[in-house]
Amino acid sequence: MKFTTSRSTPSSVPRISRITKHTLLLTAHSAKWWADQGYIVVTADGRGTTGRGPKWDRAIYENMKAVTLEDQVDAVHALPDAIASLAAETGVSMPKPDLDKVAMIGWSYGGFLSALAVLDAPDAFAAACAGAPPTDWTLYDTHYTERYLGLDPATYERNSIVADAPKLSRPLMLIHGFADDNVTIANSLRLSQALMAAGRKHTFLPLNGITHMTNDATVARNLLLLQRDFLADALV
């Protein structure tokens, strides 16, 4: 696996920022693991994340699907100049990103964004691993969805990714726990069904007895290895 391969870790999650002075331990460990596999790991906080003011926060209202993806695409396009600038500033030699081999992986909203990336931005993202993605917002908690999508059913339909299934042209792995009581597995089943109906090849990994995030160290480790192997094949 060449070090010129890039990987984007989606972080444009409403209300959550990953780019902070003190990096979350779990985020740091995950990033280091992927870097050790030979990837450039990129984290980008887009519109809707915290710490940038009300206008930034509300930019995703009724349109989080388009806005959060747009910011991740912009981050990919900015990557070569950003790395060159950082190398010049620090005097440290850094690998050049291969923008033809950019993958996105994520969990929960990050899973939604990862699946969306290969469905709606295949020119920027060559593959994706989507864990526990909320593919249809009508299936999710109203206290969350109404804050960002309001009440109009048409808005929910517009921000769903199920209808985008026929667009899939890039490798996609779906991962979901059967016991997930946060984002129910019906979300991934619904997207997988739509992909099958459209004749779109994809990988679906259902996890028996696993909730939204696995607390089984062996399962967590094997999930990383399976995603790594999937991306190694997808990004050849």
Positions of the model-derived regions?
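N-terminal cap/lid segment of alpha/beta-hydrolase-fold proteins
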Residues: 1-7
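Short beta-strand element of the alpha/beta-hydrolase
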Residues: 7-17
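Active-site/binding-pocket entry motifs
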Residues: 18-21, 134-136
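Short amphipathic alpha-helix adjacent to the substrate-entry channel of hydrolases
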Residues: 24-44
